[in-house]
């Protein structure tokens, strides 16, 4: 390699330049620097190489906060709709108005390959930097900083590949190669199985070269991936790989680019064991450095702490501000307290929240009142959704159509709901002047428990105590009554199919708006069923002291089977004779 080559381009095709704009990392125009400058043999502090690594985080590790044209990705699922009626990007994702030629947000291809290329540049060059800075790895060994920087780059590369795989199926694996414009890059796609094996192998190889929680040299490195993050990613990757879309019910049987050649139930066992290894080493059975955070709100608003936020595993820092509150808060307030209500939760999501005893409205010990529908519900409902009667800024919300917080006009809540999740619990308008820390949480211990419960339930013939325990832990933290095993009933009282439905609903409720539901309904292969039902909201009528809640259809759509995978960009297929397009695109 010619080390004084300027990085004035990052290639074409698979390697084209991305233009992400995210906050939280130091932005450096690294494309204008030479390799000799970025990876200097005299830079013992590794200043420029660390900036280069930060650039990979900054440009290619995306925050999910309102990232799809101002909306959460969940507004392309059955959990929410966009307030914007003017054909927003998330609506195009929802109804399938995209193609190999017409791309919309979330169909990143070149952006992830650019991140992979940058990671490979660091991997190939970091060892020439004579670091005098040290860190302590997951094994307790003190090593030069380049060891963990290389491992971090490989972690990020694994993340980018997984993001590609869940969107497109098998993609081209380039190894450690750094391709330039003049190189022959007419490479074929690898199979889905090859991609999964590669990602898992990478994570296994690097986990002990990373730090472990709590990060002893925090501050600048508080966001760094750890051994725990490696293990959490592995558990998620294997859960996806075992899921029906790729394993049991592929959309095109025998097509190894988008799934396995045949079903193997052992894949569920691999996923369960990956999650259990993390639980056993760092959770309740091991070092106890990971646990469920007592206050559900703290998960996305505080850095890792063994006391106040032990659930946090890996995140993208957003910084302090009120951007999330402004984008998603309710209408009807003045000055800087005014929200725009971009993403509106659906009645479909609200109905997935059970009663406070963990049972459905028709089986609960609590009497469900359709004219007071939020009383005695799962406490996570109030922490996820703002509804008629909720308190925000010391004000009881009026989200009936034409009410103070849902005024008639072009921009109003289409469902009568707003998001409360992720937002700081501001009590008064004066408090609203202060800025809150926000983190985009990418991996947390609560998900690990859900992954374990799902994989183990699918592998076993009937739900075991371990499956129960994982769900009970989440419900207990949420504040669900302990009666009747937190609503689950006695061990052995429900079968595998019933437990599957419970786990899927628990995942929907626990991880609402965390970019899980959109992908879950795909990997479970239930999107046709989900979108056969309309997305609903409420028409709230007030007559004297009586408030009535009537369901309304907000949006109806269908789901074409080919949409389980995005189309590969036409520009990639037309210039690479070896690039096979996804089915029916």
Model-based region annotation:
Residues 20-22, 112-115, 198-200, 296-358, ...:
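Long, intrinsically disordered, low-complexity segments
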Residues 67-85, 174-177, 210-229, 245-344, ...:
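Short, surface-exposed recognition loops and adjoining beta-strand edges that mediate ligand/DNA contacts
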Residues 118, 195, 202, 250, ...:
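Alpha-helical solenoid repeat scaffolds, predominantly canonical TPR units
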Residues 128, 311, 368-445:
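Flexible, polar/acidic helix-loop-strand segments at domain edges
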Residues 163-167, 172, 214, 237-249, ...:
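Short coil/turn linking the two alpha-helices of tandem helical-hairpin repeats
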Residues 1-31:
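Bacterial Sec-dependent N-terminal signal peptides
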Residues 45-63, 85-168, 182-219, 370, ...:
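Conserved, well-structured interaction surfaces
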Residues 21-73, 102-103, 353-371, 375, ...:
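Membrane-proximal, proline-rich intrinsically disordered regions
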């Amino acid at each position: 390699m010619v080390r004084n080559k300027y990085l004035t381009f990052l290639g074409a095709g698979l390697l084209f330049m991305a233009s992400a704009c995210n906050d939280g990392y130091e932005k450096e125009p690294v494309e204008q620097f030479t390799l000799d400058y970025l990876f200097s043999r005299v830079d013992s502090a590794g200043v420029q190489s660390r900036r280069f690594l930060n650039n990979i985080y900054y440009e290619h590790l995306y925050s999910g906060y309102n990232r799809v044209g101002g909306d959460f990705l969940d507004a392309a699922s059955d959990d929410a709709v966009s307030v914007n009626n003017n054909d927003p990007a998330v609506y195009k994702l929802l109804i399938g108005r995209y193609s190999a030629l017409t791309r919309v947000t979330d169909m990143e291809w070149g952006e992830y390959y650019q991140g992979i290329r940058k990671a490979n540049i660091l991997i190939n060059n970091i060892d020439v930097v004579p670091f005098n800075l040290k860190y302590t790895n997951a094994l307790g060994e003190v090593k030069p900083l380049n060891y963990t920087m290389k491992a971090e780059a490989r972690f990020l590369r694994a993340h980018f590949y997984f993001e590609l795989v869940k969107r497109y199926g098998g993609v081209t694996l380039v190894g450690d190669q750094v391709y330039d414009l003049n190189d022959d890059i007419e490479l074929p796609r690898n199979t889905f199985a090859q991609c999964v094996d590669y990602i898992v192998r990478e994570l296994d190889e690097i986990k002990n070269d990373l730090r472990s929680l709590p990060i002893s040299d925090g501050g600048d490195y508080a966001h760094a991936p750890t051994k725990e993050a490696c293990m959490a990613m592995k558990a998620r990757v294997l859960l996806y790989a075992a899921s029906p879309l790729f394993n049991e019910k592929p959309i095109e049987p025998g097509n190894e680019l988008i799934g396995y050649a045949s079903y193997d139930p052992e894949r569920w066992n691999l996923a369960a064991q990956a999650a259990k290894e993390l639980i056993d080493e760092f959770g309740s059975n091991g070092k106890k450095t990971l646990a469920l955070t007592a206050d559900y709100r703290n998960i996305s608003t505080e850095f890792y702490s063994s006391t106040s936020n032990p659930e946090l595993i890996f995140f993208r820092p957003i910084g302090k501000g009120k951007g999330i509150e402004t984008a998603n808060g309710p209408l009807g307030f003045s000055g800087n307290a005014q929200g725009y209500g971009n993403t509106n939760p659906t009645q479909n999501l609200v109905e997935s929240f059970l009663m406070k005893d963990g049972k459905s409205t028709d089986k609960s010990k609590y009497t469900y009142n359709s004219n007071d529908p939020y009383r005695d519900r799962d406490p996570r409902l109030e922490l996820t959704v703002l509804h008629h009667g909720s308190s925000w800024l010391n004000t009881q919300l009026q989200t009936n159509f034409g009410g103070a917080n849902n005024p008639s006009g072009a921009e109003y809540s289409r469902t009568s709901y707003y998001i409360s999740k992720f937002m700081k619990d501001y009590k008064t308008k004066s408090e609203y002047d202060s800025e809150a820390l926000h983190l985009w949480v990418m991996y947390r211990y609560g998900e690990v428990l859900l992954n374990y419960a799902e994989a183990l339930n699918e592998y076993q013939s009937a739900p075991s105590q371990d499956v129960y325990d994982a769900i009970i832990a989440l419900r207990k933290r949420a504040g669900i009554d302990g009666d009747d095993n937190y609503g689950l009933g006695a061990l052995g009282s429900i079968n595998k199919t019933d437990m599957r439905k419970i786990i899927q609903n628990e995942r929907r409720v626990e991880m609402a708006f965390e970019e899980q539901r959109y992908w879950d309904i795909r990997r479970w292969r239930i999107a046709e069923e989900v979108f056969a039902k309309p997305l609903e909201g409420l028409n709230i009528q007030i007559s004297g002291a009586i408030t009535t809640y009537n369901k309304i259809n907000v949006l109806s759509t269908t789901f074409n089977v080919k949409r389980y995978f995005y189309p590969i960009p036409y520009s990639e297929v037309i210039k690479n004779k070896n690039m096979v397009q996804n089915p029916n695109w």
